[in-house]
Amino acid sequence: MAIAPRGRFAPTPSGDLHLGSLVAAVGSYLHVRSQCGTWLLRIDDLDAPRVVPGASDRIQTCLEAFGLHWDEVVYFQQPQQEHYQAALEQLTATGRVYRCQCSRKQLSQSGDSVSVDGSLRYPGFCRDRQLSSEIEGSDRLNVQNLPAIALEDAWQGRYQQDLAQAVGDFILRRRDRLFSYHLATVVDDARQGITEVIRGLDLLASTPRQIALQQLLNLPTPHYGHLPLVVWPNGDKLSKQTKAPPLDLRQAPALLSQAIGHLGLAMPSDLQGAPVGEQLAWAIAHFPAPRLSKQPDSLS
């Protein structure tokens, strides 16, 4: 018997949602609802220094204003530390985890190449030093000799990456003892039974790292789909860093119409700006768009 799809929207509570966030949320919502699946809300509050007080509550209020009602209870990362620790111990038992003392300054001065996500590719300075776990530092995963990771993305097609060449050994737990986004995401997706990960194109390059962790931890790999980003006219991604304005809940119907349009759906003119429930019902019945662009969609 086929497993009912389970998707999720997992914002970081570092501020309010903006149009780019809304497009990602609506895309993941429509993807699972169009298959009669379950849609979950996860608050990625693991990185405590980035959490803005009250942002989690505002995110939930915002989603409800747009008719994006989630199933089950909201899942928070902060209470899941023991599960991340267990996963790290399981990875350590494979012999692929090592302590690293390299600072960002050292790496920036190393002259090594830039990785696929814009950060520096780790050159492996500490890989063979066999540093004690009692020494202050981060924990990295040795990706040398791992097979290339390939996936079939729902919208971007086939994507392949050799982790050793593309990113190098990556961090599982930071120097400040916070678990990494990649490790936490993999553990959370498995614990929540996520089968569909629909998110922005900026996260495609990080997906092979997550698949590698799933394979090493013997966890299932979800289906992935990476949506084209919403960008400013100059090509910069809409984000908190580029001053994307927070969503105005008073304009929810108009903004939802805009988000649905960014997903390639040509909604009838009489539904433009209609109550959010009516718009979502139509979009669920017509998702996905026959030809969703792979390119970023500029904000007009």
UniProtKB/Swiss-Prot annotation:
Binds 1 zinc ion per subunit. Zn(2+) binds at residues 100, 102, 122, 126. It comes from the Bacteria. The keyword Cell cycle does not apply. A motif ('HIGH' region) lies at residues 11-21. Keywords: Aminoacyl-tRNA synthetase, ATP-binding, Ligase, Metal-binding, Nucleotide-binding, Zinc. The keyword DNA-binding does not apply. Its EC number is 6.1.1.-. A motif ('KMSKS' region) lies at residues 237-241. ATP binds at residue 240. GO terms for biological process: glutamyl-tRNA aminoacylation; tRNA modification. L-glutamate binds at residues 8-12, 44, 181, 199. Its cofactor is Zn(2+). One of its GO terms (cellular component) is cytosol. One of its GO terms (molecular function) is ATP binding. Catalyzes the tRNA-independent activation of glutamate in presence of ATP and the subsequent transfer of glutamate onto a tRNA(Asp). Glutamate is transferred on the 2-amino-5-(4,5-dihydroxy-2-cyclopenten-1-yl) moiety of the queuosine in the wobble position of the QUC anticodon. Belongs to the class-I aminoacyl-tRNA synthetase family. GluQ subfamily. This is Glutamyl-Q tRNA(Asp) synthetase. It comes from Synechococcus sp. (strain ATCC 27144 / PCC 6301 / SAUG 1402/1) (Anacystis nidulans). The lineage of its organism: Bacteria, Bacillati, Cyanobacteriota, Cyanophyceae, Synechococcales.
